[in-house]
């Protein structure tokens, strides 16, 4: 099994662990055609309950 030849510094370890944060992307938002509120694509609108011009969930 491979073993490191030198100890990784705290800075190198922190840089490696911080890389996942740079890879994150903000989820795209689209506007609901029924109510005009922003929603995530391919999901039921949480404000009006519509998906593809059909009421899927009854929102009170």
Curated annotation (Swiss-Prot):
GO molecular function, one example?
Answer: structural constituent of ribosome
- Superkingdom classification of source: Bacteria
Q: Do you know which InterPro entries this protein is assigned to?
A: Ribosomal_bL32, Ribosomal_bL32_bact, Ribosomal_zn-bd
Q: Which residues cross the membrane?
A: none
UniProt-listed GO biological process terms: translation
GO cellular component, alphabetical, reads: large ribosomal subunit
Report keywords, A-Z.
Answer: Ribonucleoprotein, Ribosomal protein
NCBIfam families xrefs: rpmF_bact
User: Which family does the record assign?
Assistant: Belongs to the bacterial ribosomal protein bL32 family.
Name of the protein: Large ribosomal subunit protein bL32
The gene designation is rpmF
